[in-house]
Amino acid sequence: MASVGIAPNPGARDSTGVDKLPEEMNDMKIRDDKEMEATVVDGNGTETGHIIVTTIGGRNGQPKQTISYMAERVVGHGSFGVVFQAKCLETGETVAIKKVLQDRRYKNRELQTMRLLDHPNVVSLKHCFFSTTEKDELYLNLVLEYVPETVHRVIKHYNKLNQRMPLIYVKLYTYQIFRALSYIHRCIGVCHRDIKPQNLLVNPHTHQVKLCDFGSAKVLVKGEPNISYICSRYYRAPELIFGATEYTTAIDVWSAGCVLAELLLGQPLFPGESGVDQLVEIIKVLGTPTREEIKCMNPNYTEFKFPQIKAHPWHKIFHKRMPPEAVDLVSRLLQYSPNLRSAALDTLVHPFFDELRDPNARLPNGRFLPPLFNFKPHELKGVPLEMVAKLVPEHARKQCPWLGL
């Protein structure tokens, strides 16, 4: 493996490199199928101006290539580690580097997932490398495409202005969220498990949305238990609050339904202060779940006595001028029974998104909409022809020549 190092500044590169992976990591077989091997860098800096030097290529007769990243600023942090914005000194390209502490005993599930993903509405992995600290802690660095905004910040922006988000943006963002979910659920078999406005990146010029942060993502296997204490509180599906361990990708659909409601309202629909409080907030809107609905979420709770509360009509939650299609879609996504929630692909053909299929649809500034109909064959595999005809409007069919429509 190539020797790589860290340089404190462009003029004085440190010569100390790490020539090989630690012994325990030889079993990890980490390979980047974009012709980029996971290399190791020595050092751990995210301070502004810090330069990280790594090597890519060198396989299948490919020339080795040195890439240097200069850390610019921290853009996010959490229990996982830190995300910082960096610039590639060779190309001038801005990237995001997510740095996570790596347990040497295990493969990194996020890296494995990211390598499978290739979609216009999912953030892409460019490269990855390892770095070590003085204490010999190992960090995995995921070099990702940089997208400057988040849906969370866009919501805050409109709140500050005391305005409702223009409906065209609500439709655009929600459509792209469900297109990303349809892809990861149907094509990859992965459940994201942490859909929330902070994990939805937005390009403020094109309004293209990209799903990010696959740190909680997992392939759900029928019959295999999963942890229920995942997903951020306001967006947690009720079956997770009930402690279900055999849930499905419908938990992402619930979360995305909560995001849609928040885009329409300007604030979270279910702002619970704790797990139990979260359930109370849901019951206040959906009413007390029936015995049958409880059984669908977690059979262990069917005997539990819940306060009997009537459902609050959806049209009273949203203002009078709210389009009925918007209210209808929210009601189809936020169902207690996971199997009754609209699947991500079915959601894309909902009438709420018909405006996006209009050949004359434009952004408020007159620009074209971002690409919405450039489906790849695997995205629509097994989809009935009449549904495909709805998903790919006539004016966009040249983007999918493989369809033969």
UniProtKB/Swiss-Prot annotation:
Keywords: Acetylation, ATP-binding, Kinase, Nucleotide-binding, Phosphoprotein, Serine/threonine-protein kinase, Transferase. Residues 69-353 form the Protein kinase domain. Its EC number is 2.7.11.1. InterPro entries: GSK-3, Kinase-like_dom_sf, Prot_kinase_dom, Protein_kinase_ATP_BS, Ser/Thr_kinase_AS, STKc_GSK3. Roots, shoots and leaves. The keyword Acetylation applies. The modification Phosphotyrosine is found at Y229. The keyword Kinase applies. It catalyses: L-seryl-[protein] + ATP = O-phospho-L-seryl-[protein] + ADP + H(+); L-threonyl-[protein] + ATP = O-phospho-L-threonyl-[protein] + ADP + H(+). GO terms for molecular function: ATP binding; protein kinase activity; protein serine kinase activity; protein serine/threonine kinase activity. Coiled coil: none annotated. ATP binds at V75, G76, H77, G78, S79, F80, G81, V82, V83, K98. SUPFAM superfamilies: Protein kinase-like (PK-like). One of its GO terms (biological process) is positive regulation of response to salt stress. Autophosphorylated mainly on threonine and serine residues. Belongs to the protein kinase superfamily. CMGC Ser/Thr protein kinase family. GSK-3 subfamily. Binds to KIB1. This is Shaggy-related protein kinase alpha. It comes from Arabidopsis thaliana.
